[in-house]
Amino acid sequence: STSTSTSDYSAADRAELAALSKVLAQNAEAFGAEALARMFTVYAATKSYFKDYKDFTAAAPSIKAHGAKVVTALAKACDHLDDLKTHLHKLATFHGSELKVDPANFQYLSYCLEVALAVHLTEFSPETHCALDKFLTNVCHELSSRYR
């Protein structure tokens, strides 16, 4: 698909994502730091984009700060399901043109965020997982769009 359309999200997906976005916003630092720390452990090559970082654990101030930034951006993107392309354009350009991040890394971080949420949320139903996976797939697609 070339962009996210309204039809990509059912009413149930939208309800799941609206609830999840609140949880993400309230716990951005904790979930973000854990997701990044998991990514740096499981996909060690991703560390190459963070040359100034010495500590890649979830307790590191730099990991907490970047994790909070990422998860806050994802929570805000949940409010723009019908126009992710426009909403994420600046971030896509920054990551694609300036940072030149390998687009595969967006998917790696998505996997790690899903694991972190599944571990910590008591209400992480298959329906929540499905809606989140659909959303993160669309976010990854849009963030990768400035490479082409």
UniProtKB/Swiss-Prot annotation:
InterPro entries: Globin, Globin-like_sf, Globin/Proto, Hemoglobin_a-typ, Hemoglobin_oxygen_transport. It holds the Pfam family Globin. GO terms for biological process: hydrogen peroxide catabolic process. It comes from the Eukaryota. O2 binds at H66. Gene3D superfamilies: Globins. Residues 8-148 form the Globin domain. The modification N-acetylserine is found at S1. Heterotetramer of two alpha chains and two beta chains. Involved in oxygen transport from the lung to the various peripheral tissues. Belongs to the globin family. This is Hemoglobin subunit alpha. The gene is HBA.
